[in-house]
């Protein structure tokens, strides 16, 4: 068969192989909020619908820095209801992994300790290491610049499709254009 993707694992992590069920289990303890650093060089996200919960997968998502900050990170994506996620400051099982911080907004934590997406739709995931906040909320996306009619960051709102998969806008002018996601967690 096809070669399996290698799994990056930190030292002293117990691994159990269950040949009767054709499964393996990596016994990882997620970092407590106080053990998650207040800044990071990167924040990664993996899920059961992308990356196959494997930090060695090509499907691992790198969150984007907010401006030039080392503590605030975002990612906008469409997720199916029930998608499970985990985050990390490195792409290694047992090193820097977390699923909840002190303030968790817009999601539940499963019995396995994983973040669970509440309903199918497009969400903005916001991780603020400084305030120890993870927020998963519906995005509001605006366009701005001369093509949008001005440089106010909230001048031209995009419209979300009924299935929540796409957002669209018609530009009133030609010229420069930027996209600005409003991040509700910044208001908290």
Locate the predicted segments by residue.
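Insoluble glucan recognition modules
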Residues: 1-188
């Amino acid at each position: 068969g096809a070669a399996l993707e290698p799994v990056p694992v930190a030292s002293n992590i117990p691994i159990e192989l269950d040949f009767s069920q054709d499964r393996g289990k990596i016994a990882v303890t997620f970092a407590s909020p106080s053990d998650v650093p207040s800044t990071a060089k990167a924040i990664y996200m993996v899920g059961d619908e992308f990356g196959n919960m494997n930090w060695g997968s090509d499907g691992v998502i790198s969150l984007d820095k907010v401006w030039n900050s080392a503590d605030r990170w975002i990612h906008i994506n469409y997720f199916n209801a029930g998608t499970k996620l985990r985050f990390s400051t490195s792409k290694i099982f047992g090193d820097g992994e977390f699923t909840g911080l002190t303030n968790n907004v817009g999601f539940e934590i499963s019995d396995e300790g994983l973040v669970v997406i509440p309903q199918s739709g497009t969400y903005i995931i916001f991780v603020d290491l400084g305030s120890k906040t993870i927020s998963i909320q519906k995005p509001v996306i605006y366009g701005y610049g001369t093509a949008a009619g001005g440089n106010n960051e909230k001048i031209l709102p995009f419209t979300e499709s009924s299935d929540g998969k796409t957002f669209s806008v018609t530009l009133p002018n030609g010229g420069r254009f930027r996209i600005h996601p409003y991040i509700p967690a910044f208001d908290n």
